[in-house]
Curated annotation (Swiss-Prot):
UniProt-recorded Gene Ontology molecular function terms: ATP binding; tRNA binding; tRNA-uridine 2-sulfurtransferase activity
Main subcellular location: cytoplasm
Catalyzed reactions: S-sulfanyl-L-cysteinyl-[protein] + uridine(34) in tRNA + AH2 + ATP = 2-thiouridine(34) in tRNA + L-cysteinyl-[protein] + A + AMP + diphosphate + H(+)
Record has Protein biosynthesis as a keyword: no
Organism: Borrelia recurrentis (strain A1)
Protein name: tRNA-specific 2-thiouridylase MnmA
Amino acid sequence: MKIAILLSGGVDSSVALYTMIQKGYKNIKCYYLKIWLEDELSYIGECPWKEDITYVDSVCKKFNVPYKIINLQEEYYNRVVTYAIEELKMGNTPSPDIFCNQRIKFGAFFEKINEKYDLIVTGHYAKIENKNNSYTLKQAKDKIKDQSYFLSHLSKKQISKLHFPLGDLLKSEIRQIAHEIDLPNKNRKDSQGICFLGKIKYNEFIKYHLGELKGNIIEQETGKILGTHNGYWFFTIGQRKGIKLSHGPWFVTEKDIQNNIIYISNSTNYLKQGKEQFLVHKTNWINKPLKNNNLSAKIRHGEKKIKCKIETLKDEIIRVNLEEKDYGISPGQFCIFYKEDECLGGAKILKTLI
């Protein structure tokens, strides 16, 4: 069996490689995907992939496994960056990680290697089960690190080629393995950036592509101007972090993109504005549910799932009814559907209702 393993330079993908070697697989080649555009790097002033490559090289030497760097800069820009920029301009909150997985890691990369491999292995926290050639995507054992949310827009064809060996391990167990086998990157911190952005903060990415534009911050209930901000594209509905005003905490409740205004409420009023019904569209079903009840939804990456029912309307729009209110439902983000621990697929949030 020919196996391709995606290495990021981090601990997770390195332990995934070790796990496959321990299982006896020998025909293995590793790949590092380079996506950074040089003008972005010159603006931000740091080259995040050089350190990655150092670790990839040392890990592959340790296990005597070949590796190759694949350049996907053009594909990354055309398939992910342009999507994120357009969503931000429309006042939406994009989810670049979802499309990095669908369009880059398991899209453009699959195209580059021309399906020469029997299996593609990564360090994602998720599980893939195959029963009678019927594939399901499931949550990882580590519910805090679980990445099924970001994998929800993969196709069955993509999933059929994937293997996630870390799905049955906790992060603490992976760190322990890394120390036991003395991985060169055993003490490397996890990446906190979006997608492949590594060390680069999301706001720096947005600032580079959209710049800054002063606008007013207005209290929702009184219409009073409380301060200024640097552009509506830096904010999302429900956001608390970054609103540097006294008498808080404050939360973003609305965005006026025509006039570049951010509306906010304090915690008391904000808690009255939760939503339990909203519309989604552009649905990707990995496995479409047979019944529309007894489902759960994730509105954002994290542990929390909310029980829900769904109803298909005209034009393939779905109405989602949550069993409890959520306070940060934002158009452009994604709602991911689950049946117990199985990730069924996901859809783009169109608008909130009640």
